Amino acid sequence: MFKKYKNQDLDMAFWWKKNPKTPSDYARLIIEQLNKFSSPSLTQDNKRKVQEECTKYLIGTKHFIVGDTDPHPTPEAIDELYTAMHRADVFYELLLHFVDLEFEARRECMLIFSICLGYSKDNKFVTVDYLVSQPKTISLMLRTAEVALQQKGCQDIFLTVGNMIIECIKYEQLCRIILKDPQLWKFFEFAKLGNFEISTESLQILSAAFTAHPKLVSKEFFSNEINIIRFIKCINKLMAHGSYVTKRQSTKLLASLIVIRSNNALMNIYINSPENLKLIMTLMTDKSKNLQLEAFNVFKVMVANPRKSKPVFDILVKNRDKLLTYFKTFGLDSQDSTFLDEREFIVQEIDSLPRIISSTTEVSNNNASSSNVASITSPSSVMNNQSSILTHSTSPDSR
């Protein structure tokens, strides 16, 4: 069922014969070993011994939980183990000493944690309920990810803890705790880091947190305007300054969120901002076709909005002709009928926008018409230095 390291079967067979344990002893012995890491008299040799013992106890715990022992544990024995682990705050203590553990031990901890989250009794997720009652463990998990980045050579710790966070997000009660924790905002910063694996893991955590439970996110996160403003600021930074993957994934996340009906508050604030429109239009001219398409999924919502803010309307009017030129080549090679229908609709919406009359053009004698044009083409400061934003072709190959 699980990948085994060299000589694991031999080591475990010897260990079981030498140290038979009752279910509750697993938790006690793990805690005893973890406490040794804090001893001021701990030598490097002794630390290695403690690390080895922790790894063995964690492997033994995993085998017991999945019933991979002889004899197989009874349901009562497994219940006893879960109770003992929760009572001793085993996961909290493991996270406190995560940096001290061996790679194999951290991996076993992640597997045990995932198994425990899925364990149910009487239609209740026992470990999930425990973590809800002890949110300090989730908070420590989020902080441990940051601590790992502050230490040299601890990238694997970040990735392991990241997987544990994603497992938590699958459960609405735990996702709620994560969304409320200020530490979540740090992952927007982690997503901008140059390390590909760290950035990707951070984006996966953010995507999971904001999409796994749409009703929870809309009712308890985006119902707060302060959260919306901060989220937009953070996501825009990723879209503007991140790597290609970061730009694409963050734009994709934003697009998926603003089309959810219950996220109207987020959508209305985002699509009525001229600065946001300028950013999206810039992304639509990226050399990557994939990123262009993700940006289009945001742009189409802005254009289709029947109640555009005046600054947004002015930008679209000012760029009307350039947008129409842009869409002559955009997405023509797509076979997606839905996309093609949306593209055609957006082109029609843009084409229906008023045309700007140049100041050098002879003005009509019709005073009413002249007045109307003047009101539409009044100078706008929104598009300073942006006049050529949509002039280049979308022909480069996608990444």
Swiss-Prot record:
This is Protein HYM1. Belongs to the Mo25 family. PANTHER family: CALCIUM-BINDING PROTEIN 39-RELATED (PTHR10182), PROTEIN MO25 (PTHR10182:SF3). GO terms for cellular component: cellular bud; incipient cellular bud site; mating projection tip; mitotic spindle pole body. InterPro entries: ARM-like (IPR011989), ARM-type_fold (IPR016024), Mo25 (IPR013878). GO terms for molecular function: protein serine/threonine kinase activator activity. Residues 383-399 have a biased composition (Polar residues). Pfam families: Mo25 (PF08569). It comes from the Eukaryota. Present with 1280 molecules/cell in log phase SD medium. GO terms for biological process: budding cell apical bud growth; intracellular signal transduction; regulation of DNA-templated transcription; septum digestion after cytokinesis. Residues 363-382 have a biased composition (Low complexity). The lineage of its organism: Eukaryota, Fungi, Dikarya, Ascomycota, Saccharomycotina. Residues 363-399 are annotated as: Disordered. It comes from Saccharomyces cerevisiae (strain ATCC 204508 / S288c) (Baker's yeast).
